[in-house]
């Protein structure tokens, strides 16, 4: 995958993939992986700004260009808020904070230490991808001075020129995840906790979303509880990192909960499949999502659907495997196969 090209800080709005969404909120396409895959959201209120998720280090020039295009200086940013510390959301945070003299970083207490000293987070990434590929995808991750980091405990309220932003603990996708409820618009910035919804899968203005079960902290039951907590806020819209604004929130929330339960069922079906476990989960997950997309009315050909899901299916399957392994560690003695149990 290629890194987005740097953008001049003087670039006009028309030259940037910057979309106004309403209520002083803008979506910036980071260019990570492909277009309309990864969004950085900016909020502007009375000349002050907040940035929700940063994408990777490669996106920082675009974020600074977006601020300039909106008539803002780097010193006008009060908050950089991370929904969680996966690097497609937080990889650029340290580099961006170095360019924003007035900003403070807001992050879940479990993620704060990884932003202050990202060495373990970065090493784990390099262990998975190799250093060269990790740098190509994310760039290096810069540390942030602890004095500039605010731990987002559940219920913490931030203010942006008097506009209240409430941070809400949101485990299930990751234990270091928060969502942010903007009380002015009623909208919720959900990161990955309200799933993934690619605009290519929209049908007649109706979005399709599916859960993100990225390893290694996917917890299906907990994720459903987090979805319920967001639904209880009765938001008119929810903003996802992948990709941006969705409406018809109750319908999408019900779909996400149903599919989260199906993810768990697929995992349990193949829990004792040995060396075939991951491959079987991956195949069933691909079939599930393809079937759901057809039922939604998506008419893209199979090759295009597979291409759009090419990162998510293996990653989500790995997350289901991580969940199964965590269950096994908590209950090390597996149940004996019975008449209705899957064969080992």
Residue ranges, per PLM feature:
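Metallo-beta-lactamase
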Residues: 4-10, 56-58, 115-171, 175-239, ...
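C-terminal regulatory/interaction regions
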Residues: 2, 265-344
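Active-site metal-binding motif and surrounding structural segment of the metallo-beta-lactamase
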Residues: 61-107
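Internal alpha/beta domain cores that form substrate/cofactor-binding pockets in large enzymes
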Residues: 216-233, 238, 246-286
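Conserved beta-strand hairpin/beta-sheet module of binuclear metal-dependent hydrolase folds
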Residues: 14-70, 180-192, 196
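Residue-level marker for buried hydrophobic side chains located in beta-strands
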Residues: 50-52, 81, 105, 187-189, ...
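A short, structured active-site edge motif that brings together acidic residues
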Residues: 106-113, 118
């Amino acid at each position: 995958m290629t890194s987005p090209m740097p953008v001049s800080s003087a670039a006009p709005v028309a030259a940037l993939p910057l979309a106004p969404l309403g209520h002083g909120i803008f979506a910036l396409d980071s260019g990570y992986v492909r277009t309309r895959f990864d969004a950085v959201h900016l909020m502007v209120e009375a000349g002050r700004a907040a940035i929700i998720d940063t994408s990777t280090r490669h996106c920082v020039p675009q974020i600074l260009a977006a601020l300039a295009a909106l008539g803002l200086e780097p010193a006008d940013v009060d908050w950089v808020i991370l929904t969680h510390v996966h690097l497609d959301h937080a990889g650029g945070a340290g580099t961006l904070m170095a360019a924003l003299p007035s900003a403070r970083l807001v992050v879940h207490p479990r993620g704060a230490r990884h932003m202050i000293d990202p060495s373990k987070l970065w090493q784990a990434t390099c262990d998975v991808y190799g250093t060269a590929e990790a740098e190509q995808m994310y760039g290096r991750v810069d540390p942030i001075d602890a004095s500039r980091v605010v731990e987002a405990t559940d219920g913490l309220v931030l203010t942006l020129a008097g506009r209240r932003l409430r941070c809400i603990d949101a485990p299930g996708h990751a234990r270091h995840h928060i969502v942010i409820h903007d009380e002015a618009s009623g909208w919720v910035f959900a990161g990955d906790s309200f799933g993934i919804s690619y605009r290519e899968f929209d049908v007649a203005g109706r979005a399709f979303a599916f859960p993100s079960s990225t390893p290694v902290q996917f917890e299906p039951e907990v994720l459903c509880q987090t979805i319920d907590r967001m639904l209880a806020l009765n938001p008119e819209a929810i903003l996802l990192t992948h990709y941006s604004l969705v409406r018809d929130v109750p319908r999408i929330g019900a779909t996400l909960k149903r599919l989260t339960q199906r993810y768990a069922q697929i995992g349990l079906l193949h829990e004792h499949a040995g060396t075939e476990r991951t491959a079987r989960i991956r195949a069933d997950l691909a079939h599930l999502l393809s079937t759901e997309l057809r039922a939604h009315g998506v008419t893209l050909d199979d090759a295009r659907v597979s291409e759009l899901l090419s990162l998510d299916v293996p990653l989500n399957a790995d997350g289901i495997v991580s969940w199964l392994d965590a269950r096994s560690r908590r209950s090390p003695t597996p149940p004996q196969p019975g008449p209705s149990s899957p064969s080992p």
